Amino acid sequence: KLIHYSTDYVYAGSNPNASEEDIPIPDKTWYAYSKLLADEHIIRHSEDYLIVRGSHRINPFPYDTAWQDQIGNFDDVDILVDQWIKLIKSEQKGVWNIGTPTKSMYEYASREKDVNSAPAPDHFPKDTTMDLTKLNNFLKTYDEI
């Protein structure tokens, strides 16, 4: 099985709360374009794959300023890795969005420490929210096993 960690940035030019079935439209970054190219190559050339789209952050938040206008489903790397491991152990396939409820980067950073707020630079996507319905339904079932 081919397992690929992609990014929520592939949805940055899409509608908010993009689902796995939506056509991803990356925003302004080469990072997003390169991840989407990898995703599409895997989908076209592999039958047994798991593509996980998410955005993890290190904990504690390492900066003194956080962006109040960048929103997404990002969270601590250990939380998202737990979701990823459950998908792998249960031999899931296809494309999966992983993350936690929508929040701003400022809200995320403020959970751990006092930070200043500022707008995100123009070259960063502002909205990378994803539909997590598929993941949440899976996690309910997985946790019952």
Regions found by a protein language model. Name each.
Residues I51-G54, P62-K89, G94:
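Substrate-positioning beta->alpha
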Residues K1-K28:
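Conserved Rossmann-fold NAD(P)-dependent oxidoreductase catalytic core, especially the SDR/UDP-sugar
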Residues L2, D48-L50, V95, V115:
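Hydrophobic anchor at the start of a short beta-strand
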